[in-house]
Amino acid sequence: MNSKRSCVYVVLFLFVAAILVISAGMAVNQLKEQFVDIQNEAQTMNDNNIVDKLRKRNKDVIGYLEIPDTTISYPVMQKKDNPDFYLNHDIDKNYSFYGTPYLSAYCDLEKSDNLIIYGHNINGGKMFGALTQYRDETFYKKHKDILFTTKDKKKYKIFSVISVNKNDFPYWKFVMAQDEPDYDTFINKVRQYSIYDIDITPKYGEKILTLSTCDNRRGDDYRCVVFAVELVG
């Protein structure tokens, strides 16, 4: 009797597991379909036009983020009166487990020294899942540039990749440098945590772009973070 009961439990477990796997696959496909039209438009339209068009769809759109030849090609949101709203909402403000990349509510596009963008780490490289590939230096060498369009398209060059406990290094608190020593201290700290060395050191006054996602393989408090400096001229 116990043997039969165990068999029933095993069958039920496998059935539930199969349902969960299928559901997860359907959800990822739904996520892909949700952004595919936007990504196709971004490839064919002028960069400023795609941002303007998306703003008409939702005034919370503040820019468009791309890392060429990766899966990262998404609108970026910001809602200062509800900072984490897009952690679990799509561009149309509908609930979404996967959310939409969003700029920290503490950041000002024009004034901040460091623009911090958050996104979920989704299996298959969706949303900011591709950021974890930067733990491999070979991947970095093939994808050194980040494009972020707001009023104009700006190019950023990656200078550090870290995987860190957010409580050990609260990088997310640095938005505006108090002075040059404060800026340099932050940059040195970032480079100290770098997984591998990159021969680029931002100078005071240069704008930083920070992309942050969960590093699921290390634990709930760990983040995989990519830092880049704006190229001017």
Q: Which functions belong to the PLM regions below?
A:
Residues L20-G233:
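Solvent-exposed, non-transmembrane regions of membrane-associated and secreted proteins
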Residues M1-V16:
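N-terminal Sec-pathway targeting helices
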